[in-house]
């Protein structure tokens, strides 16, 4: 079991219960899932780029990514409905906790010119979204084998009812918010 999950059960739950005055353990917000998304617009011209992006995402997450397809045709972007244009992974359970631990302790500190993550990137319902400009911050990616530096979106979905609850939950995990 991931250390962060044990830490959540042992310490974070008690801390949040006293902070927000919850009566039941089930009221305490928890991390539900983490979604990783990589949009590969250049895949229209070269299908191999999408395969490389999917391989990178699989290495980062430890799970086979789902290839996302265009929902509708857009002439300006030269895409048709059904074209593969990206890939995504939804992590839950044990894999989610392991990824969350690696994200906080290893990957985020390796971001160039890192001064903390914005605390304003919540969606109003306690879910946090962030963008990573380079996939090479993850130790699973071999720098020498990277064909192109790509970014990815990371969304942390919580059961929090408000942004304040979500912020308190992530702050309890020592999430590196900008001061």
Swiss-Prot record:
Biological process annotations from GO: translation
Tell me the keywords, alphabetical order: Ribonucleoprotein, Ribosomal protein, RNA-binding, rRNA-binding, tRNA-binding
Q: Which domain of life is it from?
A: Bacteria
An MF annotation (GO) of this entry = tRNA binding
Q: Which InterPro entries match?
A: Ribosomal_uL5, Ribosomal_uL5_bac-type, Ribosomal_uL5_C, Ribosomal_uL5_CS, Ribosomal_uL5_dom_sf, Ribosomal_uL5_N
Q: Does the keyword RNA-binding apply?
A: yes
Which Gene3D superfamilies would you find in this protein's record?
3.30.1440.10
Pull one GO CC term from this UniProt entry. ribosome
Q: So what does this one do?
A: This is one of the proteins that bind and probably mediate the attachment of the 5S RNA into the large ribosomal subunit, where it forms part of the central protuberance. In the 70S ribosome it contacts protein S13 of the 30S subunit (bridge B1b), connecting the 2 subunits; this bridge is implicated in subunit movement. Contacts the P site tRNA; the 5S rRNA and some of its associated proteins might help stabilize positioning of ribosome-bound tRNAs.
Q: Which family does it belong to?
A: Belongs to the universal ribosomal protein uL5 family.
Quaternary structure and interacting proteins, as annotated = Part of the 50S ribosomal subunit; part of the 5S rRNA/L5/L18/L25 subcomplex. Contacts the 5S rRNA and the P site tRNA. Forms a bridge to the 30S subunit in the 70S ribosome.
Database matches in PANTHER family: 60S RIBOSOMAL PROTEIN L11-RELATED
The UniProt entry, under NCBIfam families, shows:
PRK00010.1
The name this protein carries in UniProt is: Large ribosomal subunit protein uL5
**Source species of the chain:** Proteus mirabilis (strain HI4320)
Which gene holds the coding sequence for this protein?
Answer: rplE
């Amino acid at each position: 079991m991931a250390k962060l999950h044990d830490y959540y059960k042992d310490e974070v739950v008690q801390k949040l219960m006293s902070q927000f005055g919850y009566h039941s353990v089930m009221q305490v917000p928890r991390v539900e899932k983490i979604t990783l998304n990589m949009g590969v617009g250049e895949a229209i011209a070269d299908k191999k780029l999408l395969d490389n992006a999917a391989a990178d995402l699989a290495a980062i997450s430890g799970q086979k990514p789902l290839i996302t397809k265009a929902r509708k045709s857009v002439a300006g972007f030269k895409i048709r409905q059904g074209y593969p244009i990206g890939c995504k992974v939804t992590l839950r359970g044990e894999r989610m906790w392991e990824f969350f631990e690696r994200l906080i302790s290893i990957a985020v500190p390796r971001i160039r010119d890192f001064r903390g993550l914005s605390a304003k990137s919540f969606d109003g319902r306690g879910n946090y979204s962030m963008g990573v400009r380079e996939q090479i911050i993850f130790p699973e990616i071999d720098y020498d084998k990277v064909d192109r530096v790509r970014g990815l979106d990371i969304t942390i979905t919580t059961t929090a009812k408000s942004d304040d609850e979500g912020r308190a939950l992530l702050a309890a995990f020592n999430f590196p918010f900008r001061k």
